[in-house]
A protein has these predicted regions:
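Short runs of predominantly hydrophobic/aromatic residues within well-ordered alpha helices
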Residues: 2-5, 9, 35, 55, ...
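N-terminal acidic leader/helix
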Residues: 1-29
């Protein structure tokens, strides 16, 4: 599978971040519902990209950043 990294970084990541912000406002950033959504959606997107290492590492960075924000 050839991956369009430009599309991934310019569309997929920003769209996911926007949905993440919306979800955190809906259910609360610290809620189990939010974190389940985070893990589920990250997993789904990574699978769409056949768990490509750059994709999974990027989402790993985002997940770690979110955890730090949560305190």
């Amino acid at each position: 599978m050839r991956i369009d990294y430009i599309d991934f970084f310019s569309r997929v990541i920003p769209e996911w971040m926007a949905r993440s912000n919306q979800k955190s406002q809906e259910v609360g950033f610290g809620s189990d519902t939010y974190w389940l959504w985070v893990v589920t959606t990250i997993g789904e997107i990574c699978k769409q990209y056949n768990d490509d290492s750059l994709v999974t590492e990027q989402f790993g960075l985002l997940f770690n950043w979110l955890e730090k924000q949560a305190g």
